Amino acid sequence: YSCIYCQLGRTDHMTKQREMFFPVKDIIAELDRVLKDDIRFDVVTIVGEGEPTLYLGLGELITDIQTRIEMPVAVITNGALLYDTQVRSELFDADIVLPTFDAFDQASFKKINRPHRSLDYEMVKQGLINFSREYQGQLWLELMLMSEINDDLESLQKYAAALNEIKY
């Protein structure tokens, strides 16, 4: 995605290809360094400068983090890859998943999310619906309402209809 509201600006390289951006062991080593500082925290959140589900080591990372802490592990995601059964399976081990759901049809999806050209709204929505029915953890939906873009009564009614299909 290259969402119109992203605080990081436009996405330079649009992809939906999953990659091993960093070795899992390097991320875990950094976590271990932080844990040695005995800092109090409530949750470990996996998020990045980009979409976490593009990371091919996500499932292993979640599992490795959970072996080191007793706190919940959360993943913040735009939800674009939830149509992929492998991605959904990897997220099942997270305690909390926070997918973005801020479009209600193809036109709003293109306007707000500016997705990869091969993604369409129905595919992404169905992936979220499927995930919501399979996932046993906490599902926290992120809905971004923007003045004069998607906050009018008609848009809100369309959101409500779409949200009724999701188990949360």
Regions found by a protein language model. Name each.
Residues 26-49:
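Short Fe-S-cluster ligation motifs
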Residues 53-168:
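Conserved AdoMet/S-adenosylmethionine-binding subsite of the radical SAM
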Residues 1-24:
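Canonical Radical SAM [4Fe-4S] cluster-binding loop centered on the CxxxCxxC motif
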Residues 18-22, 49-56:
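Short coil/turn segments at secondary-structure boundaries
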Residues 7-12, 40-44, 103-108, 138-140:
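Short, basic/glycine-rich phosphate-binding loops at helix/coil junctions
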Residues 1-6, 31-34, 102:
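Short, compositionally biased "basic patch" segments
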Residues 7, 43-47, 74-76, 98:
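Short, conserved beta-strand segments within well-ordered enzyme catalytic domains
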